[in-house]
Amino acid sequence: MINYSERIPNNVNLNENKTLQRALEQWQPSFLNWWDDMGPENSSNYDVYLRTAVSVDPKGWADFGYVKMHDYRWGIFLAPQEGEKKITFGEHKGQDVWQEVPGEYRSTLRRIIVTQGDTEPASVEQQRHLGLTAPSLYDLRNLFQVNVEEGRHLWAMVYLLHAHFGRDGREEGEALLERRSGDEDNPRILTAFNEKTPDWLSFFMFTFITDRDGKFQLASLAESAFDPLARTCKFMLTEEAHHLFVGESGIARVIQRTCEVMKELGTDDPAKLRAAGVIDLPTLQKYLNFHYSVTSDLYGAEISSNAATYYTNGLKGRFEEEKIGDDHKLQNSEYEVMDVAGDKILTRHVPALSALNERLRDDWITDVQAGVDRWNRIPAKFGFDFRFTLPHKGFHRKIGMFADVHVSPDGRLISEAEWTHQHKNWLPTESDRLYVHSLMGRCLEPGKFANWIAAPARGINNQPVNFEYVRFN
């Protein structure tokens, strides 16, 4: 018998719920088999300095200590219940939130939970080789922290499936462990989660940009009228903040190191900087363009009847719904979207309900831009003119209005011929990727960092930068 509060830290009264115990007991061995097969490569023996969620108390929700990842205590936590909580948007606005799934929304809610749940193991699979080329112990530990928390987020979604969706939910829980990122026959649900994450530059961009999509999706589900889903996502957001920090600070340290070498050598010539073993800023810009455009597609089409239905039915709200000053029903509201008309990109107003994907994408863009602005302080501090910019939202898109046209980063509609000629200046080329790949060698001495990345300003949980974050046995 498993001691539930110890083996699976939780605040869902697992000890009392025999049906749920049985379901999770069957699922747990499959999960551990998946982790051993598809989790971080060659890492089963490492003792890693990790935080583990142990409660939802803001002051002490996490414990830090050394743990083998296979033995990590993947817990199930929902943010605390809020008194007599009411639905805040859609046609049910003002009614009590739901503690059980209404029959008419059962299949839609299940699909929403499965789609979100599928991204969690997918990113672990995408990142499983990265430990073999970690630029430092500090970074290796951060990678593993992100991985175990993606694993915990999978547990959180599987808990909802098991607790509220009966046999269908149990089958979906198994299927979440059977799909594989990039697999031809049984891929992950969303395209971006079938892309490779071949190097640490891609990993930092992914955690900065694509995990930020996760933040906005979770935040809109945290508004849901289905209270267990809302509370689950609210607590997941607490952990997601560290993932975004890993990405933003990781790229900032790459920029810092490149600027140091630019100053030493008195040049911004990419060839000379590459000869010195750092990543030139234009190459970083190309990686930014790539990850930004691929992630933008995750929001779906600009005009979406699905998004309108989810909102009207109370299943998925807007980012920070309660802070928005409107009627929260949107029957008569409009929202501005871009449109391709002949050889021009115009804007037009459409019913706000149909443009909820675009609104969430715009909220995400504002947040990404704030991070890019922080990066731009680094070259400015060194006295360099280079600034990172986000490409036009029509650039390199495969979904929505811009799927069938070519748009340059500065927002011009261009011909197939110009795209073919120019895209190598805007997106990473094979030789860019090979160069970045050539820098990826393991650097595992405490306090030492690979040549292409600067040390962080401080360590994790008040530990020094040269702390032994991972012990190899």
From Swiss-Prot:
Keywords: Aromatic hydrocarbons catabolism, Dioxygenase, Iron, Metal-binding, NADP, Oxidoreductase. One of its GO terms (biological process) is phenylacetate catabolic process. One of its GO terms (cellular component) is cytosol. It is an enzyme of class 1 (oxidoreductase). It catalyses: benzoyl-CoA + NADPH + O2 + H(+) = 2,3-epoxy-2,3-dihydrobenzoyl-CoA + NADP(+) + H2O. It comes from the Bacteria. Belongs to the benzoyl-CoA oxygenase component B family. The BoxA/BoxB complex catalyzes the aerobic reduction/oxygenation of the aromatic ring of benzoyl-CoA to form 2,3-epoxy-2,3-dihydrobenzoyl-CoA. BoxB acts as the benzoyl-CoA oxygenase, after being reduced by the reductase component BoxA. BoxAB does not act on NADH or benzoate. Monomer. The subunit composition of the active BoxA/BoxB protein complex is not known. This is Benzoyl-CoA oxygenase component B. The gene is boxB.
